Swiss-Prot record:
It comes from the Eukaryota. Signal peptide: none annotated. Expressed by the skin glands. Belongs to the gastrin/cholecystokinin family. The keyword Repeat applies. This is Preprocaerulein clone PXC202. It comes from Xenopus laevis. The modification Sulfotyrosine is found at Y13, Y77, Y141, Y156. The pharmacological activities of caerulein are quite similar to the physiological activities of gastrin and related peptides. The keyword Iron does not apply. InterPro entries: CCK-like, Gastrin/CCK, Gastrin/cholecystokinin_CS. The lineage of its organism: Eukaryota, Metazoa, Chordata, Craniata, Vertebrata. GO terms for cellular component: axon; extracellular space. The modification Phenylalanine amide is found at F19, F83, F147, F162. Residues 1-9, 23-73, 87-137, 151-152, 166-187 form a propeptide.
Amino acid sequence: NDERRFADGQQDYTGWMDFGRRDDEDDVNERDVRGFGSFLGKALKAALKIGANALGGSPQQREANDERRFADGQQDYTGWMDFGRRDDEDDVNERDVRGFGSFLGKALKAALKIGANALGGSLQQREVNDERRFADGQQDYTGWMDFGRRDGQQDYTGWMDFGRRDDEDDVHERDVRGFGSFLGKAL
């Protein structure tokens, strides 16, 4: 294929990164884009295959677990990164994309849930405290930055709840002591 490679010296010894060859086409840019897209697709497919083999066992092991997968093909109990293989399907690219999107969605949802629980309590806990928030619209979406509540209630994490005005008159002193407590806990 040497005669079909670029005249400017761009060689493709393995053949997997030879995008943009100018065989009989005039629109080099379109060829580049399609070639690069194909390269990215192959690289992603190879990475997914390597990851599935490493994290989900050999293909033989995964085949043995077909009967334990979800009906939609999105789950593999032993291979948790084997996105949505459906043995009878032909459209591998669509399946990979949908399975990978499902995996990313589940991972993001889990991360957000863990972060919300760790930093600000569960959603139900925060909803219960809506009536205890400032009337001036200062909201606490995550629960870990809700400083300034006036009812003496403790923040879930407690490490940034400085400056509450419970029954004290000297707000500045309260702020200073609360901020010192915050720094102490943070350190």
